[in-house]
Amino acid sequence: MSGRGKQGGKARAKAKSRSSRAGLQFPVGRVHRLLRKGNYAERVGAGAPVYLAAVLEYLTAEILELAGNAARDNKKTRIIPRHLQLAIRNDEELNKLLGRVTIAQGGVLPNIQAVLLPKKTESHHKAKGK
């Protein structure tokens, strides 16, 4: 017989995405496509999109974690751009990474210069009282 037909052949395994193989939520296939189409290099290795997707996922998780904490501190259950701004600007490393980034509707960090604050005069009151 000519080896055709289904009798004896192995069943094809269920397709498994590269994201699930790498244990990631971010799409490795899409990142690979964007790297190829973006004219960053003539060729793109198999590990590059996995690594880049992992880095993007980590940064996103880090920012969302801090933004969720900022939302909880403000007694809110929904993250808004203000919470993202507070999360990024209060974290030294993220602030350095995203220093030139403007977040729409993010506002600014509350900051009052020390010289503008009212002076403490308690020591003078005690001295005059004696």
Swiss-Prot record:
Residues modified as Symmetric dimethylarginine: R4
BP GO terms, sorted: heterochromatin formation; negative regulation of cell population proliferation
Compartment(s) of residence: Nucleus; Chromosome
UniProt cross-link Glycyl lysine isopeptide (Lys-Gly) (interchain with G-Cter in ubiquitin), position: K14, K16, K120
Modified residues (N6-succinyllysine): K10, K96
SMART domains linked: H2A
Positions of post-translational Phosphoserine modification: S2
Gene Ontology CC annotations of this record: extracellular exosome; nucleoplasm; nucleosome; nucleus
Modified residues (N6-acetyllysine): K6
Modification type Phosphothreonine: residues: T121
Predominant location: nucleus
Residues with PTM N6-lactoyllysine: K10
Signal peptide stretch: none
PANTHER family registered for this protein in UniProt: HISTONE H2A
Subunit structure: The nucleosome is a histone octamer containing two molecules each of H2A, H2B, H3 and H4 assembled in one H3-H4 heterotetramer and two H2A-H2B heterodimers. The octamer wraps approximately 147 bp of DNA.
Protein name per Swiss-Prot or TrEMBL: Histone H2A type 1-C
